[in-house]
């Protein structure tokens, strides 16, 4: 499955309990179509103690969400946007904001 966002992209959540939150993509999982976004979809994980190294605790961490629930966030428009792919004169591909023309 192809994902429209990449690692280190700034995205905004468009549906679900975290609707409206923005964050950076920490990791993308193309096989499952999910992304891990910083500060979004926080879950509590019960961590088991290891031999003298780590104490048992309840840790809050990000869980992956479906990539269809996020859109790329354009810093110039200050809005969620769709992207188009454009080939420059030197042959390199860039992603372009459909609203303002800013490159990512």
UniProtKB/Swiss-Prot annotation:
One of two assembly initiator proteins, it binds directly to the 5'-end of the 23S rRNA, where it nucleates assembly of the 50S subunit. One of the proteins that surrounds the polypeptide exit tunnel on the outside of the subunit. One of its GO terms (cellular component) is ribosome. The lineage of its organism: Bacteria, Bacillati, Bacillota, Clostridia, Eubacteriales. This is Large ribosomal subunit protein uL24. InterPro entries: KOW (IPR005824), Rib_uL2_dom2 (IPR014722), Ribosomal_uL24 (IPR003256), Ribosomal_uL24_CS (IPR005825), Ribosomal_uL24_KOW (IPR041988), Translation_prot_SH3-like_sf (IPR008991). Keywords: Ribonucleoprotein, Ribosomal protein, RNA-binding, rRNA-binding. One of its GO terms (molecular function) is rRNA binding. Belongs to the universal ribosomal protein uL24 family. Part of the 50S ribosomal subunit. SUPFAM superfamilies: Translation proteins SH3-like domain (SSF50104). GO terms for biological process: translation. Pfam families: KOW (PF00467), ribosomal_L24 (PF17136). It comes from Clostridium beijerinckii (strain ATCC 51743 / NCIMB 8052) (Clostridium acetobutylicum).
């Amino acid at each position: 499955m192809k994902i429209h966002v990449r690692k280190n992209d700034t995205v905004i959540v468009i549906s679900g309990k975290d609707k409206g939150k923005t964050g950076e993509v920490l990791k993308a999982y193309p096989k499952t179509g999910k992304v891990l976004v910083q500060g979004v979809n926080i879950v509590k994980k019960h961590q088991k103690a290891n031999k003298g190294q780590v104490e048992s605790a309840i840790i809050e961490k990000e869980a992956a969400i479906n990539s269809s629930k996020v859109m790329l966030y354009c810093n110039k428009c200050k809005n969620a946007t769709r992207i188009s792919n454009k080939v420059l004169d030197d042959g390199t591909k860039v992603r372009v904001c459909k609203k303002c023309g800013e490159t990512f």
